[in-house]
Amino acid sequence: MAVTIHQLRTWKEQGRPISVLTAWDFPFATLLDQAGVDVLLVGDSLAMVALGYPTTLPLTLDEMLYHAQAVTRGVNHALVICDLPFLSYQESPQQALRSAGTLLQQAGVAAVKLEGGYPDMAKTVHYLVDRGIPVMGHVGLTPQSVHQFSGYRRQGTSDVEADRILQEAIALEAAGAFAIVLEHIPAPLATKITQTLTIPTIGIGAGPGCDGQVLVTADMLGLSAWQPPFAKAYTNLQESITGAVQQFCDDVRHHQFPQ
């Protein structure tokens, strides 16, 4: 049975952790879905892991739409959520509605995710939710603000920062967000936010106290040349793929394939 937004809230109430991974194409989406992941996020991290951009900032809405369409074609079970890319929603709530509507209508995703909190993004979330667009929030380290943060630094380390992030999360829930990603913040802060909100929190580099956990699939599978300190590689596909390709090339050169 397909995972729904309502199911995520039920799982939070039951204390059942939520698994989330990123996807950017049909083959990976199919495999991850068949393996039983709860949520697939078509994350703007695909800018780096699939398209070779240095940050998420160059990714366009058209590129995101292309990848979201590929992902939804491979999914039968997981809830598919898609990031709104940089500058596709910050200008106005109306711009955000057009961008989100494109992804829901043309790619078939169930919801969108946007970065930031109070006050502007909370207003945008409210605007979208009022018009039937389910929205996931994202606070803490928001990668689209990488230059403003002077890198991918941990957020919420001071009392002032921690209170700001907490208030942003509260505002996003009040605006109608159905869940919130908490990225690269201290574990006690993430736990406090999780206990304060009635909607699910999904952590990445935020400790074990969240309602669920998300990893970039390329990091989880050992495909990334570099991965953040809070990621965990469950295998080393980079090594496996390199070895397989080298073996194929060697077989061809020595007339071992085909036989």
From Swiss-Prot:
HAMAP family on file: PanB (MF_00156)
Name the record gives this protein: 3-methyl-2-oxobutanoate hydroxymethyltransferase
Cofactor: how bound: Binds 1 Mg(2+) ion per subunit.
GO BP annotations, alphabetical order: pantothenate biosynthetic process
Binding site for 3-methyl-2-oxobutanoate: D44, S45, D83, K113
Known role: Catalyzes the reversible reaction in which hydroxymethyl group from 5,10-methylenetetrahydrofolate is transferred onto alpha-ketoisovalerate to form ketopantoate.
Organism: Acaryochloris marina (strain MBIC 11017)
Keyword Acyltransferase carried by entry: no
GO CC term (a single one): cytoplasm
Keyword line: Cytoplasm, Magnesium, Metal-binding, Pantothenate biosynthesis, Transferase
Localization per Swiss-Prot or TrEMBL: Cytoplasm
Cofactor requirements of the protein: Mg(2+)
Residues noted as binding Mg(2+) in the record, renumbered to the chain: D44, D83, E115
Reactions catalysed according to its record: 3-methyl-2-oxobutanoate + (6R)-5,10-methylene-5,6,7,8-tetrahydrofolate + H2O = 2-dehydropantoate + (6S)-5,6,7,8-tetrahydrofolate
GO MF terms, alphabetically ordered: 3-methyl-2-oxobutanoate hydroxymethyltransferase activity; magnesium ion binding
Record's keyword annotation contains Metal-binding: yes
Similarity comment: Belongs to the PanB family.
Family annotation (Pfam families): Pantoate_transf (PF02548)
Active site per the UniProt annotation: E183 (proton acceptor)
Assembly mode: Homodecamer; pentamer of dimers.
Entry-linked InterPro entries: Pantoate_hydroxy_MeTrfase, Pyrv/PenolPyrv_kinase-like_dom, Pyrv_kinase-like_dom_sf
Pathway noted in the entry: Cofactor biosynthesis; (R)-pantothenate biosynthesis; (R)-pantoate from 3-methyl-2-oxobutanoate: step 1/2
EC number: 2.1.2.11
